Amino acid sequence: MKKKALLPLFLGIMVFLAGCDYSKPEKRSGFFYNTFVDPMKNVLDWLGNNLLNDNYGLAIIILVLVIRIILLPFMLSNYKNSHMMRQKMKVAKPEVEKIQEKVKRARTQEEKMAANQELMQVYKKYDMNPIKSMLGCLPMLIQLPIIMGLYFVLKDQLVDGLFKYPHFLWFDLGRPDIWITIIAGVLYFIQAYVSSKTMPDEQRQMGYMMMVISPIMIIWISLSSASALGLYWSVSAAFLVVQTHFANIYYEKVAKKEVQPFIEAYEREHNGGSNKKGKNTQVVSKKKKK
């Protein structure tokens, strides 16, 4: 449910990003502008003008990387919680499915409440916290205002240096560029693909939709915006690809190690402490190998 809710949230954000406009001075006011947009403008201007000898392309890259590094602890916590929940659910799934069947067959409110209490006991047994799982998108919500602040600085070209010193690599930061737009779209496709690899099968369809929708939206906005925005998206997506890939490798190992005692307890419970492998044990063992 949580993952499905991210799709309309993402689409809503993209519509908001495409529609807001701070290019006119009279519109540069309000809580969001003063709290997130204006500080980003000042930092980018300081980096490009004072620290990097008017190299605003490099200033954008450094600022994006600094923001991503600051937000890294939130994202790593999200990766860890996601992998822990996924590995524990593999072990608990047979018991959870049985109780869910009881809930479906329940005819009275008392029977449903009893089944739900039983389900909570299973969650407690495997140290699973559904509320913690529901808060998994919190890191994304925390970072959005910060990332969006920089987005509006670049989209509406609020830094004068982008006009005075626009040249970076092969493109003009103040004008659209097809190649940096394509690079941004491809990188966001890869980022969505890397993220979808760790999704459960029932959620993977949503991941595939994001693989199509996010690059299209990125390309659509970038084609009519300054290439500084495409550079920002390219650097951000490249960082996320590397971050997601290595975080998934590391936290999958951590989660499997921490879940191992639950697997052993499950096997003892369903095999009576013997070496004989039953059907349920084989299911858990197969899931463990994946």
Swiss-Prot record:
Q: Which GO terms describe its cellular component?
A: plasma membrane
Family matches, as InterPro entries: YidC/ALB3/OXA1/COX18, YidC/Oxa/ALB_C, YidC/YidC1/YidC2_Firmicutes, YidC_ALB_C
Where this protein primarily resides, as one coarse class?
Answer: membrane
Instruction: Output the Gene Ontology terms for molecular function.
Output: membrane insertase activity
Q: Name one Pfam family in it.
A: 60KD_IMP
Positions with an attached lipid (S-diacylglycerol cysteine) read: C20
User: Can you supply a Gene Ontology BP term from the record?
Assistant: protein insertion into membrane
CDD domains reported for this sequence = 5TM_YidC_Alb3
Q: Does the keyword Ion transport apply?
A: no
What does the function comment of this entry state? Required for the insertion and/or proper folding and/or complex formation of integral membrane proteins into the membrane. Involved in integration of membrane proteins that insert both dependently and independently of the Sec translocase complex, as well as at least some lipoproteins.
**Protein name per UniProt:** Membrane protein insertase YidC
This chain's source organism reads: Staphylococcus aureus (strain NCTC 8325 / PS 47)
| Name of the gene encoding the protein in the UniProt record | yidC
